[in-house]
């Protein structure tokens, strides 16, 4: 039977109907559903379509879905298709942002959801010929190896790539995903106030920045924010350096007094905490260094943290810079935001970033010789944190590795 499907205009409004065969033959714009199914282990259900499908036969897919019928509510279509394709019923569906996709074979408005499911999966023989659970990382690794549905990769691939980068082994908080929300729960009581401070700081800060940042809201566990799409920066470019320069110029120009009032660690508190850290480094780390390194080490500890003039991210490295399609997709992890030295945010970019980044940064950020020198000092200080943490937690390998890096950078 040639079912009637709803046709949509460019704004996603129903504008008519047509037999499914006509919709396919003329590639008419319609509505379609897609549900990303995950289990409690975080794995995603992946399946292969049958050779008889009328579009993209025998391709791999990681969304359960189909066409919205004429007169059918899109949500009802989501529920129906999930049941028909995979035999999944009675689950809570988490709504994602709608999307649009078009190519030479199909054109539609996508109604996208995620759900959690640990029960059995029952394939519809006419639709699915194989299926299995895969970790997000393994699934992403197959994107270039297997022949996937291009629309699913375009619409839900960025979310899967983000899933693949998120782990719960953070020092300050554990993280887990629930649909399009990233939840964070403090691992220690002392961290909770800093997480909640982000719920005051980031809504004020986000509109002042040229790149996306998380805007958290409080939960019973800690905080949550909508997932920012992208993967941690691996390969640099001059263009990315320019974007980061524009971002840092905007960040360092915001009113520091207002930032502190809205939750950033104020200059006095940040300076006091840094003083404690530096004193502990003098007492615990310097004696572990060779005698010839004591004086330059003490001089370094005396120079850093002398300037506190701007709101800084305070932990800006590749793991906190998300990149999507060659552009900055987001700057994440603002727990350490404080009124501090802007050179701290330049440290990694000027001294350890991939090729091209520093040159691009210099095009959009005014880097003075004094600022460059201070950024180098912060770069030299970075391995001290690893040694300090290793001593605190009894991790001798971390201590040894950190001491070697301290000597290299001094």
Positions of the model-derived regions?
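The catalytic Nudix box helix
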Residues: 45-46, 63-95
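Acidic, metal-coordinating catalytic segment for phosphate/diphosphate chemistry
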Residues: 1-34, 40
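Helix-rich C-terminal or lid/interface subdomains of diverse kinases
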Residues: 233, 336-342, 347-410
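Active-site acidic catalytic loop and adjacent metal/ATP-binding pocket
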Residues: 167, 171-178, 183, 298-344
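ATP-binding pocket architecture of kinase catalytic cores
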Residues: 163-272, 306
């Amino acid at each position: 039977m040639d079912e009637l499907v709803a046709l949509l205009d460019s704004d996603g409004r129903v504008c008519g109907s047509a037999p499914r065969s006509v919709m396919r033959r003329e590639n008419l714009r319609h509505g379609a559903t897609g549900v990303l199914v995950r289990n409690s282990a975080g794995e995603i259900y992946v399946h292969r379509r049958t050779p008889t499908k009328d579009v993209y036969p025998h391709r791999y897919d990681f969304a359960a879905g189909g066409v919205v019928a004429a007169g059918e509510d899109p949500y009802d279509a989501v529920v129906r298709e999930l049941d028909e394709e995979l035999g999944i019923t009675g689950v809570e569906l988490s709504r994602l942002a709608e999307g649009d996709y078009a190519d030479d074979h199909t054109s539609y408005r996508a109604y996208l959801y995620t759900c959690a499911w640990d029960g059995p999966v029952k394939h519809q023989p006419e639709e699915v010929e194989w299926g299995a659970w895969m970790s997000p990382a393994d699934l992403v690794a197959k994107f270039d190896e297997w022949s996937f549905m291009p629309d699913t990769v375009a619409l839900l691939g960025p979310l899967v790539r983000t899933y693949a980068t998120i782990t719960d082994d953070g020092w300050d908080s554990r993280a887990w995903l629930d649909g399009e929300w990233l939840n964070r729960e403090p691992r220690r009581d002392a961290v909770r106030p800093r997480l909640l401070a982000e719920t005051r700081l980031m809504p004020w800060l986000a509109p002042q920045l040229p790149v996306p940042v998380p805007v958290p809201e409080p939960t019973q566990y800690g905080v949550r924010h909508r997932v920012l799409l992208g993967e941690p920066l691996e390969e640099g470019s001059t263009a990315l350096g320019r974007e980061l320069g524009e971002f840092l110029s905007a960040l360092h120009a915001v009113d520091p007094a207002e930032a502190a009032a809205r939750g950033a660690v104020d200059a006095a508190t940040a300076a006091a905490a840094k003083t404690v850290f530096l004193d502990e480094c003098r007492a615990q780390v310097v004696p572990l260094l060779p005698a010839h390194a004591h004086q330059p080490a003490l001089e370094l500890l005396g120079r850093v943290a002398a300037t506190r003039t701007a709101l800084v991210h305070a932990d800006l490295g590749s793991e906190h810079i998300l990149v999507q399609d060659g552009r900055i997709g987001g700057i994440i992890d603002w727990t350490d935001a404080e009124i501090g030295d802007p050179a701290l945010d330049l440290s990694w970019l000027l001294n350890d970033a991939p090729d091209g980044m520093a040159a691009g940064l210099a095009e959009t950020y005014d880097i003075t010789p004094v600022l460059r020198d201070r950024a180098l000092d912060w770069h030299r200080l970075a391995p001290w944190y690893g040694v300090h943490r290793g001593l605190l937690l009894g991790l001798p390998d971390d201590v040894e590795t950190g001491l070697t890096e301290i000597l290299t950078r001094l």
